[in-house]
Amino acid sequence: MTKPLRIGIVAGEISGDILGAGFIRAIKAQYPDAEFVGVAGPRMEAEGCKALFDMEELAVMGIVEVLGRLPRLLKVKAELVKYFTENPPDVFVGIDAPDFNLRLELDLKQHGIKTVHYVSPSVWAWRQKRIFKIEAATNLVLAFLPFEKAFYDKFNVPCEFVGHTMADAIPLETDKAAAQALLNLDGSKRWLAVLPGSRGSEMGMLAAPFIETCKLLKQKHPDLGFVVALVNEKRREQFQLAWQETAPELDFVLVNDTARNVMIASDAVLLASGTVALECMLVGRPMVVGYKVKPLTAWIIRRLVKTKYVSLANILADKPLVTELLQEDCVPEKLSAEVDRILSSDNTELLSEFSIMHQSIKCDADNRAAHAVLSLINKV
């Protein structure tokens, strides 16, 4: 009897859980008995992945913030190395979370396990010498964006451009009225989606300034509604606390649903930088990006980052399509002025550019990623 295909896999946050679930489905379409084990979120577990640790263990952002969790992160890594070296998979796939996964991949590769890193770290943006660590740690990198593959090719590091799963999943035209009906939102008024982050550290930094921003906008737009996507109960509790402390008189619709439906239902979006900014571009909604980290983290990042922009819409376009208000600029007065501007604009040209970029990364990523991994281990 043939031994089933066995894949080690680690995802570190919600976006990685979504990617991992799609990848698992694509592999199982060809190898129904394939086994997956590692660090997973609920979507990956629903596809049959055995979770040795909960994904929340790894979901921490910012250099200073990581230091506080370092002992636990090191313990999780050591236990994963022990498990995978004692029970070697056919291949290990680390999804994003590069500071954790690349170290894990290096250890596993040194033990003779083939390793794939899914989602290129932003080596083109900062700490470019990491490409040599990536080369040492991986047999293959799977990249979302065409310019990422071009960067790896310059250094002869194996990389496949697979496109982006979100670009595949989201139609080029989205239905605002249907999303509003799904979320029971009043279709006769305008809505601002408020997305202060999926991580606890992000919510802690952004909830209050985003709520203050809504307070200012309400003065100018009395009929504007605010709808907030909350990824889990912990984030809901954090937001509710900030709401009661900052502006209890304001009305927010809190939604335990994906950010995607909330953005589609809205006329404009105020969001934390990250994957959700790409998703907002793909659903075709004008946005303002706000982001803050602890001052020491910001000081370090400013000395390392090589790109002009933080949001992928701007990086893909290589121009400032989307307003980014970062750190000391991420204040209610500036945020509200920019949201007011997009609420008062036509935005047709902006949304046309979003659509062109959407099409450029819509490539059936799940299947391309699965094919690349299976090719690496000679299973195609």
Curated annotation (Swiss-Prot):
Q: Which InterPro entries match?
A: Glyco_trans_19
What catalytic activity is recorded?
a lipid X + a UDP-2-N,3-O-bis[(3R)-3-hydroxyacyl]-alpha-D-glucosamine = a lipid A disaccharide + UDP + H(+)
Recite the UniProt keywords alphabetically: Glycosyltransferase, Lipid A biosynthesis, Lipid biosynthesis, Lipid metabolism, Transferase
Query: What's one GO-annotated cellular component?
Result: membrane
The keyword Transferase is annotated on this UniProt entry = yes
Give the Enzyme Commission number.
2.4.1.182
Q: Which GO terms describe its molecular function?
A: lipid-A-disaccharide synthase activity; phospholipid binding
Q: Which GO terms describe its biological process?
A: lipid A biosynthetic process
Disulfide bond residue pairs: none
Signal peptide location = none
> Which pathway, per its entry?
Bacterial outer membrane biogenesis; LPS lipid A biosynthesis
Q: Please indicate if the UniProt record lists Lyase as a keyword.
A: no
What PANTHER family would the database entry show?
Answer: LIPID-A-DISACCHARIDE SYNTHASE, LIPID-A-DISACCHARIDE SYNTHASE, MITOCHONDRIAL-RELATED
**Stated name of the protein:** Lipid-A-disaccharide synthase
Organism expressing this protein natively: Photobacterium profundum (strain SS9)
Gene field: lpxB
